[in-house]
Amino acid sequence: MARIAGVDLPRDKRIVVALTYIYGIGNATAKKICADAGVSEDVRSKDLTPEDQEKLRTEVDKYRVEGDLRREVSMNIKRLVDIGSYRGIRHRRGLPVRGQNTKNNARTRKGTKRNR
């Protein structure tokens, strides 16, 4: 089982799909990583040679993924909350941040209805 960026990649999936199990790597980035590493997109992760795994690790290390990315996102949200911006207040209250209507919708963000 290939382990890249602290994540065990699934063995039976194509490497492009397996790379998307890493937080911060989507489909387009996975394809770019495979192209830059010179690894075929159709190869299964169980069939990777140790050299291919090392090439992929080197390419993935160039991106901000997993813990570093999660930390950066949470620090960005914390900064918005600390400076008291509108977006920070919406985060603090658990409401939609990007201008969505909340009169009838946003049940996921607001939580379940309480009887009034």
UniProtKB/Swiss-Prot annotation:
SUPFAM superfamilies: S13-like H2TH domain. It comes from the Bacteria. One of its GO terms (molecular function) is rRNA binding. Residues 91-116 are annotated as: Disordered. The keyword RNA-binding applies. GO terms for biological process: translation. Residues 106-116 have a biased composition (Basic residues). PANTHER family: 30S RIBOSOMAL PROTEIN S13/40S RIBOSOMAL PROTEIN S18, SMALL RIBOSOMAL SUBUNIT PROTEIN US13M. Part of the 30S ribosomal subunit. Forms a loose heterodimer with protein S19. Forms two bridges to the 50S subunit in the 70S ribosome. Belongs to the universal ribosomal protein uS13 family. This is Small ribosomal subunit protein uS13. It comes from Lactobacillus helveticus (strain DPC 4571).
